[in-house]
Amino acid sequence: MASKLPSVLAATEEEIQLLLAAQCHIGTKNCDKQMEPYVWKRRADGIHILNIGKTWEKLVLAARVIAAVENPNDVCVISARPYGHRAVLKYAANTGAQAIAGRFTPGSFTNYITRSFKEPRLIIVTDPRVDHQAIREASYVNIPVIALCDTDAPLKFVDVAIPTNNKTRHSIGLIWWLLAREVLRLRGTIPRTSDGWNVMVDMFFYRDPEEVEKQQQEEAAAKLAAQQGVETEAPAGLSEWDVSSALDWAADPAPGTTTDWSAEPAAAAGGGWGADTGTAGWD
């Protein structure tokens, strides 16, 4: 089936390779009835494979919807899934949107008394199943919803579904990166060239805080070692240690230094233990 997009918006070979490398086409064993049009086939092990062509078509459609919002701050990006926290924050920093990374506070769209109250014109969620609270509240106040949907995702109250794998860090980060780049292109902020945007896709990938801390410690230790010129070799003085001066524990003991423990004890200077100790004058 030929793409319905104009040639200028069609996916390039490099973009298709990125989607395949990030495993955006890998679905789940379960498949929602409304997600069947986006499924290409089902593997022998039961995993559904998504159609990458339709993924790109819906991604461009979502970008055109986002670019139609005059004020970028009226777009709210949401991710309760940890793998999407860094992606939505980077997307918001590059496009000017609002970001909610982590738990969505109930009432953020409906209860104007709360401190986290927002009135966006459009919301984008990472997973309809995890971000169900935000989608439900958006339906109460007529806010359109764009969602990254896997094969098992419910499409209730979702207006634009981007079929993709929303379970792994690389697929989530890549889709958010492609979406941000396409939005900036449609707004005219960056040119439509391969090197028009200098933000790497790695910046959108989730990173484990423990791995980041360990990497920072290793870099700091390496920098300190380079500054101080620490030598990894052992000091030369240790190799010249005179072994002959050490005690020879295997040699015979020196004469006169042993004691015969089986011999009778020597008599005390004042006599035996039973001798009079001269206590007569105590009283």
From Swiss-Prot:
GO terms for cellular component: cytosolic small ribosomal subunit. It holds the Pfam family Ribosomal_S2. Residues 247-283 are annotated as: Disordered. It comes from the Eukaryota. InterPro entries: Ribosomal_uS2 (IPR001865), Ribosomal_uS2_CS (IPR018130), Ribosomal_uS2_euk (IPR027498), Ribosomal_uS2_euk/arc (IPR005707), Ribosomal_uS2_flav_dom_sf (IPR023591). PROSITE patterns: RIBOSOMAL_S2_2. GO terms for biological process: ribosomal small subunit assembly; translation. GO terms for molecular function: structural constituent of ribosome. It is found in: Cytoplasm. The keyword Nucleus does not apply. The keyword Phosphoprotein does not apply. Keywords: Cytoplasm, Ribonucleoprotein, Ribosomal protein. Belongs to the universal ribosomal protein uS2 family. NCBIfam families: uS2_euk_arch (TIGR01012). Required for the assembly and/or stability of the 40S ribosomal subunit. Required for the processing of the 20S rRNA-precursor to mature 18S rRNA in a late step of the maturation of 40S ribosomal subunits. Component of the small ribosomal subunit. Mature ribosomes consist of a small (40S) and a large (60S) subunit. The 40S subunit contains about 33 different proteins and 1 molecule of RNA (18S). The 60S subunit contains about 49 different proteins and 3 molecules of RNA (25S, 5.8S and 5S). Interacts with RPS21. This is Small ribosomal subunit protein uS2. It comes from Laccaria bicolor (strain S238N-H82 / ATCC MYA-4686) (Bicoloured deceiver). The gene is RPS0.
